[in-house]
């Protein structure tokens, strides 16, 4: 959540950030501006009434001590107190309205984030490893998976519905091996391995920014204040919800393997075949809580940690700087890692590393103490990696002419 003080003192800065995102919020933003104007006016009136109450109370005390008639002052105090209580209630209600609007305003766009109108304006930063030259036409992963008997898409539909799959046989061993490899690499890079619940309450989803704006994107448990997590970013970040840590404990670096659940609202017709876009998938996540001065360096560290895994698996990939219009709700700056898929003849996102600055920390009240003063931390998150998409990339990049899959050396010891 952005700072309420910033909204009150520099409304134009917030409006400009929304414009950079191609998200002007239209009439809603105008109504918010009207509420803020009304709030400021009432706040001035309230301060005036409080000052008057203090002044008259002081006079009342003096006259009481002098044993002078105070009936007029008493009446003034009583009338002013009624006005004061009514106005205090009104100001409180306006503050709630402002905070409710604040909860659906996305993060401020970072100065480092380039301007753009759509994902077409994202900027390639660098490429790592050269895509292989095939002597045959490479197949897509769903063909290879079915040929090798690794993924059963029909059973996924039978057990649940479309966008679910069953992984079995040697494919399941590869899937498990990838998870172990990812966690080992992340641990080597200083991230603590943590296993968390796959269910969280509403407060936790508010803390990381999924609620209230993106309620359609998450699965809710009927008759319970519980939701299936869309990412371990939610659980890892919120381990420090409403917490103050000493500055000496920063940075806090965490990694977790969890199932993730997403409704994929608005994705009808996209990636309908295969494992690219599923309602349930596994992901190994990185989350860091840092001092504000260290978050930029941490973002680079997290990117390199994820890239290191792809290099070990001999998978060509690239770093892509997202433009302002393609940023996620909580992100101030995001760099994607896209892996090469020869079957599709294109790069596809496999990791997204975001610096949210103090946006999530303000929502979740994540603070640190330095020089006896509490300050908001910075939080970062990123995939390291999406397991299903990594398996997709492994199959497509390491396929042989006969449809068999070469296993990279780094993965052999896990099988």
Regions found by a protein language model. Give the residues of each.
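TRNA-recognition modules of translation machinery and tRNA-sensing kinases, especially anticodon-binding
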Residues: 127-415
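N-terminal alpha-helical targeting/anchoring segments
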Residues: 1-132, 150, 154
């Amino acid at each position: 959540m952005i700072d309420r003080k910033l909204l009150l003192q520099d409304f134009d800065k917030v409006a400009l950030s929304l414009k950079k995102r191609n998200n002007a919020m239209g009439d809603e933003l105008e109504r918010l501006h009207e509420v803020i104007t009304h709030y400021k006016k009432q706040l001035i009136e309230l301060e005036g009434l409080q000052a008057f109450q203090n002044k008259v109370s002081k006079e009342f005390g003096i006259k009481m001590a002098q044993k002078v008639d105070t009936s007029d002052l008493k009446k003034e105090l009583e009338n002013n107190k009624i006005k004061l209580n009514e106005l205090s209630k009104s100001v409180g209600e306006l503050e709630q309205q402002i905070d409710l609007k604040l909860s659906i305003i996305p993060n401020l766009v970072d100065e480092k984030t380039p301007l753009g109108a759509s994902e077409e304006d994202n900027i390639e930063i660098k490429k790592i490893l050269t895509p292989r030259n095939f002597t045959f036409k490479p197949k897509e992963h769903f063909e290879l998976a079915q040929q090798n008997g690794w993924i059963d898409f029909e059973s996924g539909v039978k057990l649940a519905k479309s966008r679910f799959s069953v992984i079995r046989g040697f494919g399941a061993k590869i899937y498990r091996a990838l998870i172990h490899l990812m966690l080992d690499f992340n641990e080597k890079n200083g991230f603590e391995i943590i296993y968390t619940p796959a269910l969280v309450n509403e407060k936790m989803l508010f803390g990381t920014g999924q609620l209230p704006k993106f309620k359609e994107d998450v699965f809710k448990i009927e008759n319970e204040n519980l939701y299936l997590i869309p990412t371990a970013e939610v659980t890892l970040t919120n381990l420090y919800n409403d917490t103050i840590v000493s500055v000496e404990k920063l940075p806090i670096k965490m990694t977790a393997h969890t199932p993730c659940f997403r409704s994929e609202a608005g994705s009808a017709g996209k990636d309908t075949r295969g494992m690219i876009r599923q309602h349930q998938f596994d992901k190994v996540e990185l989350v860091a809580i840092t001092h504000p001065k260290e978050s930029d360096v941490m973002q680079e560290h997290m990117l390199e940690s994820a890239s290191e895994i792809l290099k070990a698996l001999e998978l060509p990939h690239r770093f892509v700087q997202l433009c302002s219009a393609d940023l996620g709700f909580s992100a101030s700056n995001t760099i994607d890692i896209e892996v090469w898929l020869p079957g599709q003849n294109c790069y596809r996102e496999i990791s997204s590393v975001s610096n949210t600055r103090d946006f999530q920390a303000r929502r979740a009240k994540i603070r640190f103490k330095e020089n006896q003063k509490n300050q908001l931390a910075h939080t970062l998150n990123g995939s390291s990696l999406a397991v299903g998409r990594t398996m997709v990339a492994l199959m497509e990049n390491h396929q042989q002419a006969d449809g068999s899959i070469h296993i990279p050396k780094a993965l052999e010891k896990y099988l």
